[in-house]
Structures are given as structure tokens and as C-alpha cells.
């Protein structure tokens, strides 16, 4: 019996196929059913500006550093308000159980930047659309707000907005959700209307693209010695598998790396600010610029490059031992250099 060699499989089939995301705007496949006691949007969208480090008072009672100042890496998100330009009612298809759009209502007055991504009608007949809502009110199972980002209020320097659908939840009664959606038509929603400091959020974004990469960078294959044991190359595998099957998923292969949609769960939201000048460094964020309005501080790193759209949502699977939901005390941020 020969020596048993431990050779774990390379990569995860959970993220197969490793190809470029279909859209740079992340697609949220799951929305949690949370009980907030009042109707509210279940998510928000912001732009990644950069990272800093902050001094925060540790408020976890079981931590050895409880009550002491600790240094945390934080990500800064530029969070201009979202514009609600409509909402949709969804019913269940009796044949397959899927959601089907039943009614749609647009706001009477739409911003001019929305014409860059939508063909705007000359006049919106809101009364006619509201009759459809009343027709499907009894069979509706979900209400989703149609929102548009406002990048002209951010530090990116572009005008074309991104469009998203964000469900309205927080209460089980569908009539309360519809009433809340009607009240939001033509208005803006700030991050404080959706989240509160101290809570956990899930982050969905498209990662930074790396292009076509080899097996060493993509899967961490060992580089062979440069002067022997490398008959046909030292930055490659010895074999890519047998003749049949044609493709071995356990074998590292070169290909696309990065620009994949990824979800990171249970990131703690440290702070929601209104004045971006208090968080922006003197020379601005590198490769981003200046934050002009509301911003969000999240503990840890987030996927994606600077200027990339990041979608935040209420946690889909919060931990059993969640940190305190009270607002953390942020003592100092590294952008406040003398």
C-alpha cells in the first residue's frame, strides 16, 4: 500500500460556473421575511467609496475588550437617497407557484435623468393604474417598490441611474404595504428610513474583475521548481484529467476570475451619517472623489471595486448570538487626520 496523499478538491461547486456576472447591478434572489412592526423597504443601494479604519468602543458584553476602544477596518458607502418612481403588485401563478406581475403604478412626475434608462410617457394615467391595483388587491402576495439611484448626487460623476426592485415588508398585512407604497410614490428614501446603526445587514455586489487567469492565481496551485520537475511548465497542473469524462470539475483549469456576484452575510452597520464632508479625507477618496451627502459605515471589507453599486438588505439568516442592536460608539475615523 502506497503513501496516501491528501489532495482536497480545488474550488467550490457552489459558485460554478465561474463566469462574468450578467449585470454589474447585483440581482437579489432572496428577500427575508422580517417583522419590523411597520412597513418599510427591505433593502437599499449605495456606492462603494473606499475603506478607512475607525476606533470603536466594543459593546459586546461577552468580549474581553468590552467597554474598551478597539480599531476596526470599515468600508464607506456613498448613499444618496433612492427615488421611488413606481411600485408593482405580484400574484402567485396557480400553474407553477411563481410570482407574476399583476399591476404597476408610476409616479406622476418623473426626474429627467430617468429618461436615460427608460422611455418615459408624455403623461402617466395614475387613476387608470390605481384601478388595476384595486382589482388585484385581494389576490396580491407581494408589493415591490421600483426605485432608481441618483448618482448625480454622489461623487462618481455620472448621471445615468440604476433601476432596482425592492420589496416592501415589515408587516404581514398586504393592505398596509400597498398604502405605504402609494405614500412613497414620487418621493425619496434615505438609508435612515431603511436601516438603523448597530444592526446586521447582508451585502450583495459584483466583485472586482481580474480577467482570464491561470491556475496558480485562480486556484492556488503550487509552482513547481524552475530547474527540474517541470517538463512542460512550472505554473500548470500535471494533468487536466482522463480522456473521458471530458471535463473534471475537481481539476483546476484557467479561466475567468473575478466579476462574480457574491453575497456576504451579517455585516454590522456602524453608522449612518448625513454630511459626507465629515468622513471624506482632505484629498478625497482615491479613485472615487468626495462624498456630498449621506453615507454608511460598515464594519469590515465588502466585495466590489470603487464606484460599484452595492445592495444592502435585512439579514436573511441572522446568527443566534447577534451583537447588540444599539448604536455603536464611533470615537474616531482615520479620515479625521490633523
From Swiss-Prot:
Keywords: Ribonucleoprotein, Ribosomal protein, RNA-binding, rRNA-binding
GO cellular component term, pick one: cytosolic large ribosomal subunit
Family matches, as SUPFAM superfamilies: Translation proteins
Residue ranges crossing the lipid bilayer per the database entry: none
Domain of life, per lineage: Archaea
Coiled coil regions in record: none
Pfam families: Ribosomal_L3
GO biological process: translation
Annotated stretches, region: Disordered: 230-256, 315-338
Cross-referenced Gene3D superfamilies: 3.30.1430.10, Ribosomal protein L3, domain 3, Translation factors
Alphabetical list of PROSITE patterns matching this protein: RIBOSOMAL_L3 (PS00474)
Any GO MF annotation of the entry: rRNA binding
HAMAP family per UniProt: Ribosomal_uL3_A (MF_01325_A)
Family recorded in the similarity comment: Belongs to the universal ribosomal protein uL3 family.
The protein's assembly and partners: Part of the 50S ribosomal subunit. Forms a cluster with proteins L14 and L24e.
Function noted in UniProt: One of the primary rRNA binding proteins, it binds directly near the 3'-end of the 23S rRNA, where it nucleates assembly of the 50S subunit.
Name this protein carries in UniProt: Large ribosomal subunit protein uL3
Provenance organism: Pyrobaculum arsenaticum (strain DSM 13514 / JCM 11321 / PZ6)
This protein's encoding gene: rpl3
Amino acid at each position: 500500500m502506497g503513501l496516501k496523499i491528501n489532495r482536497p478538491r480545488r474550488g467550490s461547486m457552489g459558485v460554478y460556473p465561474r463566469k462574468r456576472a450578467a449585470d454589474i447591478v447585483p440581482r437579489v434572489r432572496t428577500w427575508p421575511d422580517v417583522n419590523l412592526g411597520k412597513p418599510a423597504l427591505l433593502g437599499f443601494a449605495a456606492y462603494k467609496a473606499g475603506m478607512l479604519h475607525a476606533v470603536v468602543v466594543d459593546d459586546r458584553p461577552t468580549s474581553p475588550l468590552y467597554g474598551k476602544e478597539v480599531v476596526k477596518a470599515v468600508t464607506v458607502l456613498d448613499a444618496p437617497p433612492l427615488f421611488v418612481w413606481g411600485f408593482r403588485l405580484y400574484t402567485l401563478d396557480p400553474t407553477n407557484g411563481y410570482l407574476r406581475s399583476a399591476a404597476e403604478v408610476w409616479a406622476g412626475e418623473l426626474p429627467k435623468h430617468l429618461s436615460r434608462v427608460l422611455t418615459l410617457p408624455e403623461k402617466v394615467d395614475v387613476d387608470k393604474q390605481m384601478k388595476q391595483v384595486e382589482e388585484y388587491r385581494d389576490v396580491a402576495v407581494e408589493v415591490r417598490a421600483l426605485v432608481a439611484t441618483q448618482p448625480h448626487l454622489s461623487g462618481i460623476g455620472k448621471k445615468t441611474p440604476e433601476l432596482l426592485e425592492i420589496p416592501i415588508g415589515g408587516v404581514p398585512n398586504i393592505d398596509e404595504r400597498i398604502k405605504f407604497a402609494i405614500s412613497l410614490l414620487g418621493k425619496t428614501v434615505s438609508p435612515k428610513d431603511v436601516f438603523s446603526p448597530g444592526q446586521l445587514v447582508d451585502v450583495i455586489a459584483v466583485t472586482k474583475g481580474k480577467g482570464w487567469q491561470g491556475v496558480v492565481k485562480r486556484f492556488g496551485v503550487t509552482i513547481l521548481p524552475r530547474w527540474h520537475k517541470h517538463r512542460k511548465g512550472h505554473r500548470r497542473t500535471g494533468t487536466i484529467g482522463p480522456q473521458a469524462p471530458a471535463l473534471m470539475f475537481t481539476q483546476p483549469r484557467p479561466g475567468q476570475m473575478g466579476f462574480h456576484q457574491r453575497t456576504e452575510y451579517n455585516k454590522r452597520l456602524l453608522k449612518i451619517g448625513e454630511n459626507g464632508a465629515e468622513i471624506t479625507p482632505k484629498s478625497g477618496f482615491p479613485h472615487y472623489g468626495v462624498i456630498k451627502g449621506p453615507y454608511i459605515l460598515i464594519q469590515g471589507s465588502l466585495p466590489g471595486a470603487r464606484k460599484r453599486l452595492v445592495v444592502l438588505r435585512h439579514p436573511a439568516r441572522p446568527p443566534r448570538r447577534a451583537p447588540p442592536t444599539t448604536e455603536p460608539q464611533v470615537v474616531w475615523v482615520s479620515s479625521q487626520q490633523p
